[in-house]
């Protein structure tokens, strides 16, 4: 008589690193570091995995949508923002970013320019999502002369020569096109 039951060994699976879109376990993909030096506090994220250029690093999920912009939100459309509810919050700005935050596909992807290596700092180019920013800041990314944009602002207020070097979200392209079509007074 056949019972249809599978042998026990078919239920045993070896642990493996699952892609983020299958099992969004960021602890397997990234580590967060925090340091305090007197009154100065800094934090950053590092990769725990090697991935090729353009690969999906993680899906963007578990976020809180908001219409209010502040220093901790990410712009996801012309009038929409969200708050991270994950360690992806610790991906800082760089003018040589290791990741791209794509709000049209809800993916964090490895930069198209280079692969991601274990130990790399996880970073994004903030103006790739932000049209305006709550707070502009002096960049300390260390990308080097001719690569670092200097003062980081929203894409609206950044130099076009600087922005042309970076991957930008669809809503940033649309807002730039809209601004270009408005006659200047």
Stretches with model-predicted labels:
Residues 95, 99-185:
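C-terminal SET catalytic tail plus cysteine-rich post-SET Zn-binding segment of SAM-dependent SET-domain
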């Amino acid at each position: 008589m056949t019972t249809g039951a599978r042998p026990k060994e078919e239920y045993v699976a070896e642990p493996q690193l699952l892609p983020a879109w299958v099992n969004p376990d960021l602890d397997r993909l990234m580590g967060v570091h925090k340091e305090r030096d007197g009154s100065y506090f800094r934090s950053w994220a590092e990769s725990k995995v090697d991935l090729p250029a353009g690969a999906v690093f993680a899906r963007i999920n578990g976020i809180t949508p908001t219409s209010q912009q502040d220093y901790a939100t990410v712009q996801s459309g012309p009038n929409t923002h969200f708050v991270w509810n994950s360690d992806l919050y610790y991906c800082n700005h760089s003018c040589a970013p290791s990741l791209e935050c794509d709000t049209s596909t809800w993916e964090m992807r490895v930069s198209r320019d280079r692969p991601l290596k274990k130990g790399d700092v996880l970073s994004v180019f903030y103006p790739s999502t932000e049209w305006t920013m709550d707070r502009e800041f002096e960049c300390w990314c260390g990308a080097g002369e001719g690569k670092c944009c200097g003062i980081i602002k929203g894409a609206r207020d950044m130099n076009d020569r600087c922005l042309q070097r970076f991957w930008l979200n669809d809503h940033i392209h649309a807002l730039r096109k809209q601004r270009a079509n408005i006659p200047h007074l």
